């Protein structure tokens, strides 16, 4: 059963500006493991990566119904990729499956998250 759906879209140029003006922005958004992956990317891909992770984490928090803040922070959410490159979020609840999709265009990054309860 679906228990939450979230979506978020961000403008790449705004993320690029934040990354340039506020170096701590990246540290605030990415977990340590995500930051390791980030360091391996080209400049253009770094912007897309941060924007995509930001959008996915916001979408996840929206699907939870809480938003980013008191109950969940950016560092509570880690997005990994499977062997085929498909992104996934590990839910702290063993009772849930989290589906995530991240996409980029020339100007935007967008993410959608669906949280599914496994037990009834």
Swiss-Prot record:
Its cofactor is Mg(2+). Its main location: cytoplasm. It holds the Pfam family ACPS. Transmembrane segments: none annotated. GO terms for cellular component: cytosol. Mg(2+) binds at residues 8, 58. Its EC number is 2.7.8.7. The keyword Magnesium applies. It catalyses: apo-[ACP] + CoA = holo-[ACP] + adenosine 3',5'-bisphosphate + H(+). Gene3D superfamilies: 4'-phosphopantetheinyl transferase domain. GO terms for molecular function: holo-[acyl-carrier-protein] synthase activity; magnesium ion binding. Keywords: Cytoplasm, Fatty acid biosynthesis, Fatty acid metabolism, Lipid biosynthesis, Lipid metabolism, Magnesium, Metal-binding, Transferase. GO terms for biological process: fatty acid biosynthetic process; lysine biosynthetic process via aminoadipic acid. The keyword Cytoplasm applies. It is found in: Cytoplasm. It is an enzyme of class 2 (transferase). Transfers the 4'-phosphopantetheine moiety from coenzyme A to a Ser of acyl-carrier-protein. NCBIfam families: acpS, pantethn_trn. Belongs to the P-Pant transferase superfamily. AcpS family. This is Holo-[acyl-carrier-protein] synthase. It comes from Anoxybacillus flavithermus (strain DSM 21510 / WK1).
């Amino acid at each position: 059963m679906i228990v939450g759906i979230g979506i978020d879209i961000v403008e790449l140029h705004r993320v690029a500006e934040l990354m340039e003006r506020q170096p701590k922005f990246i540290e605030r958004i990415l977990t340590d493991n995500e930051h390791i992956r980030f360091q391996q990317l080209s400049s253009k891909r770094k912007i897309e990566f941060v924007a995509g992770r930001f959008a996915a984490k916001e979408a996840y928090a929206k699907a939870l119904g809480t938003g980013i803040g008191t109950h969940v922070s950016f560092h509570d959410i880690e997005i990994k990729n499977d062997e085929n490159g498909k992104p996934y979020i590990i839910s702290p609840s063993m009772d849930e499956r989290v589906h995530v999709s991240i996409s980029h265009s020339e100007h935007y990054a967008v993410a959608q998250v669906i949280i599914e309860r496994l037990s009834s």
